[in-house]
Amino acid sequence: HLCAELPFARVNTGEYLGYSGKRRLIESHAVDVVNVHGSIGMSRDVARLAADYGIPVSLGNTIMEIGVHLAASLPECLFLEFSDLRWNELAVQPVEFHDGLAIAPDRPGHGIEFDRDKLAHYAAPGG
């Protein structure tokens, strides 16, 4: 009932629920935006189910460029949560942003290439 009572706000939830919990949110119309977070396969499955109900998704924080690629592949994705944590520094080419949008790279595969020198630095004691 919260969604109906708060027409001025979108209820975005479900980040820590599994597929069955997200399905219950969607089928009961208890959410305005479903937060998908977890494996790529489950995220895509939830997004397809949400699309069947006309409900958009937001993608929870997903490591490096994998989340950018996943969000770009989901037409129903409204938002991508991206915390520019230290792991983004480990990439040869970190995720780029323009005007608040994450840019999906056009490199093959998931696009992540690690900087081996930086990995070695953090693997060393005190790194």
Regions found by a protein language model. Name each.
Residues 1-101, 108:
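Shared catalytic-loop signature of beta/alpha-barrel
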Residues 106-108, 118:
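C-terminal beta-strand edge segments of enzyme domains
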Residues 120-127:
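Active-site microenvironment of metallo-dependent hydrolases
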